[in-house]
């Protein structure tokens, strides 16, 4: 039996892309999806000609809708997590989502059939605080989309994998998940 840890946003679910479509509707702007797929940073507001402050405000004003509506799950992600659980492995979720949204996030995951134990769900920390939680759990594998998070874990025994995103393609030091369907066959 092994312990698997997963970030949620932009690792298991397409949160930024979901936000992109919400922004298009709210701002009544049509932006080519290819521009989104070429972004070299996490934040998406520049695609809509918003400055940092306006982008932060747009994100905060849209947060409930972004987090708790019909955000798509990456193809194969749910199946991968369910198969790992079925094989007897422990599943942990470690997300930097704010404490205010933790319980609702857990409920959303369950509604979408992700296996979630209360004791295996961690939220409300900053990205740089994830390291302490992940180290304390002594995970065998951890998957995240942010190189800055994974960089803090390179001296641990945890096998680190990065979920492919346009903003992390310059990071070559981690095994990369492009397609969740390939995860079980190729990464273990």
UniProtKB/Swiss-Prot annotation:
GO terms of molecular function: hydrolase activity
Keywords assigned: Hydrolase
Domain of life, per lineage: Bacteria
EC code(s) of this entry: 3.1.3.-
Bilayer-crossing regions: none
InterPro entries per record: 5_3-deoxyribonucleotidase-like, HAD-like_sf, HAD_sf, Nucleotidase_putative
Pfam families hit by this protein: LNS2_PITM1-3 (PF24694)
Family to which this protein belongs: Belongs to the 5'(3')-deoxyribonucleotidase family.
Name used for this protein in its record: Putative nucleotidase OB0422
Record organism: Oceanobacillus iheyensis (strain DSM 14371 / CIP 107618 / JCM 11309 / KCTC 3954 / HTE831)
